[in-house]
């Protein structure tokens, strides 16, 4: 299991890193912000922040998808914070930040919200004809997988507790390449295996929307084409910048 | 071409149940060999078209970040599925923006992604077959590149970008669209989309001078190719002869006359439209734009102003500087380029124009935001100026103005249904069905608010509406140009209207 997790992490980091590199290096030859768009760089930062934190466009678009989608993502984030207690050492200055009651209990109950959000999204995928039409098997499977990750996590939290001291030793050992045994728990095995799968498919699937949104030219460009000339490297080269300066 | 049923207009814009394949038969005429070759594309479908298409796709994704990011990022959330006017009007699921993208995305996945190469079924990847190419040809010509879907997508995925890429790929394999490619060819050879030669243009303008003088008693000029003029006006060629476009042109001329501007049109740049964008071709878009730069240099003007046209303004505002800039030879104290509405509103604010709003009292107006202006450009110096300028001008020259349902205006405006290179008779069915959401919103204000006319600022919108709204019981003359309204209300110095106004004892509405 240690081995699997490490491989998955490497694939995830390298894969997503390469994708980010690709996005960053691919030029955007034309100014295509969806207007009205901010006219300053600061404005763009705010637009992007609203998009990433509040899902602004989705909110305008469809309240149901927004409710479920937002609920899922925020809960995922909270749950993620809760999990930090497994990787942060108790002597670290970070420890009080991750171990306090607020982070821990929010994170614990967020699991329910996460699963509810995901069930909502899954239900829509089955029930709304339009969404069913655009869904392929992987779209359903991904939701099911996340639901199982959430449910198995909740099981460990609320139903059959696991030995978290041992789990912590396992995780800390992982990063020191000092492989320890996992606590015995089916829920934990399922949980971790699916996280492995999730990390592995991340760079090869629609999960790329996470880095993608930051590179979306319709959202991250400043609306100033008249004031500032925007020219891509390939166009400049191809046309020898064509301008008789 | 009336072998289809006009959809029934309901009280509200509803989301239809899916009817698979209901628009699969809709395809525009394919470009002839010479149309293709004039633009540097193969004359007919090349032998190894699959390979050429895939190479082109690979090339595009390396040069357009939008294309690469959009292909990867869609999560199939479905938020965009009910946002496209063509879907709302046709019920064909492939007209849902995400499904339209998927026509291309499934091929991208199959050939360029790990998942699609090894698990095609799982992720909905498909081989590039002839049937897929046919689907592309059909459905990427049922997208007007209006960007409405991009407003509502959480990642800003713009199906217009995908459509443009798809059309460029189809051009590269030799399967271009006749309407667009023929027109671009005409721009190169004659100077405008309509193939109106210089002589004919001069005649039209002369005729307009006579008409306006007959009407007002003022010798308003419509100058052509005047060297040393201050302003080059670039306007869609439909403004030279189509109704109600031409009344808009008269409006621009009167405003220029009244403000004492020195201006000119150009024979070689007698077209603001640029169909290079519709086919996704940077190359052709640049070539078409270059005429404007060249004309401006040749005539030695100081400013460039664009007439009422939607996609033309997007290209002018957003791309012109990129494509053929920098415009360091123009007067830098004005926006480059400027929209005619920016000019007119500026003058109205300064108070240089005398307006008699009562001239427009027989109408109650509403305004159709053109998609490309609304979501692909700006007017003025603040975001959203593109919504205010036309409304400000209309309200300055008309007493009765009402907006349509906010779900159908400003950034959420519906395309007229004829944009993006679809304004051709061989696509009549999709055009009529695509105008349904706008027609619905219009009908509602007509019935509830007494609206009689709808103003537009785009040559394509005006042509599309006058042709398709009659299918829903409206009349052609209910569509007006914004500058037509200005023209009606403008009281020029020394005009018959001025004499009448000042001669009678009733008070005038001078501001
Ligand atoms: S709204 Fe965007 S992410 Fe959602 S299905 Fe449509 S294109 Fe995909
Ligand atoms: S760009 Fe406009 S026409 Fe094209 S898919 Fe999006 S909403 Fe439909």
Question: Positions of the model-derived regions?
Answer:
Chain B
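Ferredoxin-type iron-sulfur electron-transfer modules and their immediate structural context
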Residues: 1-138
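Short cysteine clusters
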Residues: 74-80, 84, 143-149, 153, ...
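Iron-sulfur (Fe-S) cluster-binding segments and ferredoxin-like electron-carrier domains
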Residues: 82-110, 151-170, 378-381, 421-435, ...
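Cofactor-cradling patches in redox/metallo enzymes
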Residues: 156, 240-330, 374, 378-385, ...
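C-terminal amphipathic alpha-helical segment
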Residues: 336, 340, 346-395
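Extracytoplasmic substrate-binding proteins
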Residues: 171, 292, 322-330, 344-360
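Short hydrophobic beta-strand segments
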Residues: 230-240, 363-374, 455
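Iron-sulfur-cluster electron-transfer modules
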Residues: 61-71, 101, 105-323, 503-510
